[in-house]
Amino acid sequence: VLAAGTSSRMGSNKLLADIGGKPMVRHTVAALQRASIDQIVVVTGRDSDHVIAALQGLPVICVHNPEFAHGLSTSLRRGLEVVPEDSDAVLVCLGDMPLVDEAVASRLIAAFSPAEHRSICVPVHQGMRGNPVLWAARHFAEMAAATGDVGARRLFETNSSAIVEVPLDDAVLFDVDVEADLDRLARLRPPR
C-alpha cells in the first residue's frame, strides 16, 4: 500500500481523513486483509508516525520512505525492498482509494496466471484503467528501476502482452486528491 504521498493538493494528509469513523488508509488496508493477502506492506512518508498509528492493531509491515517527495516510484521501490524473495506477485494499492474493497483484490488475484501471459492484472471500468494493479515477480526488477511519479504507464507500454484487463466497478478509478473528493465520496457510497 503506497501511503507516502505529500497530499499537496489536499493540504492536510488525506490518508488520515476520517471516513466513516476510520482513517482513509485503514479502509484500504482492511480491505486487503479481508481479501486474505498474505503480507501487507505499507510504505509511509509524510506524517509517518500518524499513518502507522492509524493502522495500529492491523497485521501490517510499515516501512518509511525518506525520499517520498521524489515521486511514487521511490515508494514502490521501498516497498519492493521488503517483499519476500519467494513472493509470486505484489498487489500495488494506493492508500487514497477507500472504495476499493476485497472483491477488487480477489478478482485481480483470480485473473492472475503468468503461465498464460497474465502477469499484470489491471482493473478497468468503462475502458479506463485504474488501481490497484497485480504484478508478477518477474516484473519486480523493472518496477524497482522506475523513476519519478509516472507510476506504471511505461511498464504497461513495455509489457503490453503480459497485461490482462479485469472489468470492475468504478471504485478502481476513484481516489481522493482534494477536499471536494471527500464530499463526493460521502455522496457516492460509504466505504466498508
Predicted regions and their residues:
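Nucleotide and nucleotide-moiety/phosphate-recognizing core
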Residues: 2-129, 137, 161-167
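A short local structural element in Rossmann-fold oxidoreductases
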Residues: 11, 52, 144-145, 186
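A general boundary/transition motif marking the beginning of the first structured unit of a protein
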Residues: 39, 143-144
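Short glycine- and hydrophobic/aromatic-rich loop-to-beta-strand nucleating segment
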Residues: 131-135, 174-176
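Short, well-ordered coil↔helix boundary/capping segments
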Residues: 134-137, 146
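Conserved alpha/beta core of the MobA/IspD/sugar-nucleotide pyrophosphorylase nucleotidyltransferase superfamily
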Residues: 141, 147-192
